[in-house]
Amino acid sequence: MTIAVGRARQERGWFDIVDDWLKRDRFVFIGWSGLLLFPCAYLALGGWLTGTTFVTSWYTHGLASSYLEGCNFLTVAVSTPADSMGHSLLLLWGPEAQGDFTRWCQIGGLWTFVAFHGALGLIGFMLRQFEIARLVGVRPYNAIAFSAPIAVFVSVFLIYPLGQSSWFFAPSFGVAAIFRFLLFFQGFHNWTLNPFHMMGVAGVLGGALLCAIHGATVENTLYKDGEAASTFRAFEPTQAEETYSMVTANRYWSQIFGIAFSNKRWLHFFMLFVPVTGLWMSSIGVVGLALNLRAYDFISQETRAAEDPEFETFYTKNILLNEGIRAWMAPQDQPHERFEFPEEVLPRGNAL
């Protein structure tokens, strides 16, 4: 008698079949994350292209914002809903639009459509990096690094307006619209003097500096086995092997600064840490602005400048500029509020 020892073959369910199809080796990997990424990215990009091409902002901001109205690439935008809409999701079938697509576009429904699908698309892209890292067998630091721009997007476009009175105070999706939002942030929140913004700038510019230094150092220390060292003819662009010297790079920077990275792991972790931490700090700062937390205030300088016409600092100058932004921007930016500022309340510098 023959006895066969082994496990009984389990029946493959629908989950296994779908899993196999999603993870099949193809030119563009789909994966489970692709079920979130591709539809959301397609809808967000399509909504933005539709809005910038055809949809006006007359009913929400009193502005022209589409190619159809004569704007160019730098001035088109998908504008935020009107302040009166509050934090409504503005669903097409909701009480505001009532299934009317034209009305939905006019009241700013495309902005919430693009914002939420865009956020989900970015999250899907991060999950895609996690999924592929697991399948390939590498660490998920790419996905962790990508969490930084996701944090910035979510904090600026979603959390900040949730802390304010409506979606109206979020940035509209357009180049000039983002610039207007930056001026708004400075005038109403003194954003450049916020310590979290300072850390964000240090992280982004520090990351750019590290990237430039790293690339230049690798180019400087290239060599090719079997031939004389040459920076400019040291390698073929398609070669597989590494042909730069970490030892030489370490010696070079040790002579310049007195210190240098001792190994590639610490060097590349630092290049990851600096910009990612900077972006996360900036995101935390924006969450603080959603709660109307203040930046640095140097009251003693403001008090002395108010009492002494000859005393003025760059800080007090900036405070006056912020007051000017608020006074001149509010009537333009929020015409529905019908602000009126008499000339005597508009800010003036001490030299005027």
From Swiss-Prot:
Entry binding sites for chlorophyll a ChlzD2: 117
Residue sites binding chlorophyll a PD2 per the record: 197
Tagged with keyword ATP-binding: no
Location(s), subcellular: Cellular thylakoid membrane
Topology in the lipid bilayer: Multi-pass membrane protein
Binding site for Fe cation: 214, 268
HAMAP family: PSII_PsbD_D2
Miscellaneous comment in the UniProt entry for this protein: 2 of the reaction center chlorophylls (ChlD1 and ChlD2) are entirely coordinated by water.
Family in the record: Belongs to the reaction center PufL/M/PsbA/D family.
Protein's name in the database: Photosystem II D2 protein
The species this protein was found in: Synechococcus sp. (strain JA-3-3Ab) (Cyanobacteria bacterium Yellowstone A-Prime)
